[in-house]
Amino acid sequence: MERKVSRISLASEPNITYFLQVSWEETVGSGFVITLTDGHSAWTATVSESEISQEADDMAMEKEKYADELRKALVSGSGSDTYKFIFSRESCHFSLEKELKDVSFRLGSFNLDKVPNSTEVIRELICYCLDTIAEKQAKNEHLQKENDRLLRDWNDVQGRFEKCVIAKEALEADLYQRFILVLNEKKTKIRSLHKLLDEIQQLEKNLKPERETKCSEKTTDQDAIYDGSTDEEAGASVLAEAAVCKEDSLFSSPDVTDIAPSRKRRHHMQKNLGTEPKMAPQEQQLQGKERLASSLPHTLKEEHEHTSAGNMSLETLRNSSPEDIFD
């Protein structure tokens, strides 16, 4: 069972202090026991749930709202400025009214019974008050200890937090210094790389004319090489010169009859006409040589044979010349 003891003043006796005790099982709306005492006498009454419902119907209010108003007046301990209590010792009638700005209305009324042994009621009331005070004091002490513990924890946390803040600031300062050092190193490295890049670009600019000069010289040499004769052309020219020289040396001899031009003319004529075989001039030449050999003396015959052998070698050289090859 729950209890609530409050101190009130009656409207008829404002200088006298009364103590009002209300106890209930579940809620105030389910019924309660009211006890009133002035320290000498005591009055009590039991209010049922049906009576509360009847009072709510008489006031045209809902039961829950009416029970809430009773709880505020009897249990919450509101001051006399909001609620007014009226009690008559002769009739033992107890009523309470709620005061508004300009009006007041009756919230409830109960018929109390005087307790024959008021001392027991007062003793129970005092014991309850003392127990409540002890309980509240123990709870207060427990809360105070808890508050002290929380305060110590808070101080400890605050100290750790301050240390963490100091360490954080020191770490930030150290990291900032390291960042500045790394940044300066990077800037220095970037400057050196830019400087090296500029030097390389300047060197490339300086080497570019030399490269162009070398390229132009190389192109000139290649043009000169392309303008020169090939190995085959050079060999052919050398052979032609040798053949010409040998022909000149042979042609300049007064003792040898040069029959090569007539033979060559015949050879060209036969090639252009394309009707006679190439071996016919050689046969005619051999016949002419035989007739000439029969008419000459023996000595001239030997000389003629020697000359014929030279002419044959000359013909071989002439046939091996570049002109005969291309013919």
Swiss-Prot record:
Give the modified residues of type Phosphoserine: 53, 192, 229, 249, 253, 294-295, 308, 313, 320-321
Phosphothreonine PTM positions: 230, 316
List every position bearing Phosphotyrosine.
226
Give the signal peptide range.
none
Span list, region Disordered: 255-327
Show the segment(s) annotated as Interaction with IFFO1: 1-211
Write one Gene Ontology MF term: enzyme binding
Example GO biological process: immunoglobulin V(D)J recombination
Record field: compositional bias (Polar residues): 308-327
Q: Where in the cell is it found?
A: Nucleus; Chromosome
Q: Where is this region: Interaction with LIG4?
A: 179-210, 179-211
* Modifications after synthesis and translation: Phosphorylated by PRKDC at the C-terminus in response to DNA damage; Ser-253 constitutes the main phosphorylation sites. Phosphorylations by PRKDC at the C-terminus of XRCC4 and NHEJ1/XLF are highly redundant and regulate ability of the XRCC4-NHEJ1/XLF subcomplex to bridge DNA. Phosphorylation by PRKDC does not prevent interaction with NHEJ1/XLF but disrupts ability to bridge DNA and promotes detachment from DNA. Phosphorylation at Ser-320 and Ser-321 by PRKDC promotes recognition by the SCF(FBXW7) complex and subsequent ubiquitination via 'Lys-63'-linked ubiquitin. Ubiquitinated at Lys-289 by the SCF(FBXW7) complex via 'Lys-63'-linked ubiquitination, thereby promoting double-strand break repair: the SCF(FBXW7) complex specifically recognizes XRCC4 when phosphorylated at Ser-320 and Ser-321 by PRKDC, and 'Lys-63'-linked ubiquitination facilitates DNA non-homologous end joining (NHEJ) by enhancing association with XRCC5/Ku80 and XRCC6/Ku70. Monoubiquitinated.
Which keywords accompany this UniProt record? Chromosome, Coiled coil, Cytoplasm, DNA damage, DNA recombination, DNA repair, DNA-binding, Isopeptide bond, Nucleus, Phosphoprotein, Ubl conjugation
Q: Which family does it belong to?
A: Belongs to the XRCC4-XLF family. XRCC4 subfamily.
Q: Where is this motif: Nuclear localization signal?
A: 263-268
| Residue(s) at site: Cleavage | 258-259
Which InterPro entries has this protein been placed in? DNA_repair_prot_XRCC4, XRCC4-like_C, XRCC4-like_N_sf, XRCC4_C, XRCC4_CC, XRCC4_N, XRCC4_N_sf
Specify the protein name: DNA repair protein XRCC4
Coiled coil start-end: 133-153, 183-213
